[in-house]
Amino acid sequence: MKLVLAISLFLAAPLVARAPSIPAADAPQLAALGANPVGLQSTTVTVAGTARSLAVMVWYPALHGGTSTTYRRHLEPATGAALDITTDGIAVADATPAAGRFPLVVISHGFGGWAAGMTYLAENLASKGYVVASIDHADGQGGGGGSAGLVRVAGAIINRARDQQAVIAALSARAAAPNDTIGRHIDATNIAVIGYSMGGFGVVATGGAPYDKAAPSLSPLGGLLDDQTVRKTIPGLKAIVAIAPWGGQPPYRAWSEAGLRGLAVPSLFIAGDRDDVSIYADGIHWLYDHATASNRWLLTYREARHNVGGNPPPPETLTRPDLAENFAEPVWRSDRINAINQHFVTAFLDRFLKGDAAHGAFLDVPTVDSDVAQWPAAGPGFATSAQAGYWPGFQKRWLLGLELRHDAAR
């Protein structure tokens, strides 16, 4: 009877919330938080030549911990009632920054997203010695349907790369000011941009691939899509991460094959092979295949759709079928995707922004298909690069359903 009561109480107890930046026990090795506490400040950036003023959240390595942040967002979906959602964090508002300069990572969310929608990456990377700036692109809410929705989509297409480059320019300028509270901790010679969905659309252009303005999806925009705002080279930009990038798929294809060869910085593409928004084969994989001047990787989640870039579903959305498809995946656990992204993004950025060959070696997997990898050791633990046949950093029994392809620049 006591055992039955104990089990009943356990099952009835609420799960303790965990900040998305803290990986679960099944996470691969480099997903773990770094040694630094995390601070958080907010700033604004004005896009040159426009009236756009962007709110930007900046996470950074801090000297000390403290009361952690709870992120809040008011959602107004296209259908159903509005609601408020919360996400736990580990960052401490206005904490004193740690000494030194750190590489800059800019995060750009998907259409209708918000600056705190990818805190699983932002806080995690800041704990590892990066200054992370996440843009609120202010797309508005309510989806892309109807005339108002089409205006919002057009605005996102026009502004994504501009916004990213404006934030890079503003924070790089602050890095040159020795007394700037955040700028003096930014290493503007080592910059990466991470974009998810529509953010990925901008990232490919920011990385150096000019849009094909004659493309059917772009030609109606006319002179509004000014290539002069999409610079061919950005000082300090060393790498991009494109998560489920939009804009490669017909009929919305925004690049020519020749234009994609302008993407010359190292790139990490992340996608689900069942993506029904950006489309895997004719969209994301097509972008990857034709970015031939980039030293590039493609991480694929088999049986995953489009939601491979954001935080796990907020608890408040779990009983809302109209919201589930905006956050959750039908097969994969979202926190599992987050942890794998944390692992590989850390390996990639450490390799190209910090010159960390040891962490960079975690990209050198022995098999493209995770399912044919063989566990080389007798017991549990993380596989090392010295253990041939298994992806380094993954644990026994926890390597399934992935592909990691690499193609050198040519």
Where are these regions (language model features)?
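Domain-level recognition of soluble alpha/beta enzyme cores
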Residues: 20-107, 127
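Short substrate-entry loop that stabilizes the transition state in hydrolases
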Residues: 65, 88-102, 107-145, 249-250, ...
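The feature captures the conserved acid-bearing segment of alpha/beta-hydrolase catalytic domains
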Residues: 96, 221-301
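Active-site rim elements
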Residues: 150-155, 251-256, 326-339
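Alpha/beta-hydrolase active-site loop
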Residues: 152-188, 205
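Residue in the alpha/beta-hydrolase core beta-strand immediately N-terminal to the catalytic nucleophile
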Residues: 190-192
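Gly/Ala-rich beta-loop-alpha elbow adjacent to hydrolase catalytic centers
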Residues: 195, 199, 203
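Alpha/beta-hydrolase-fold serine-hydrolase catalytic core, especially in secreted/extracellular enzymes
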Residues: 294, 303-306, 311-410
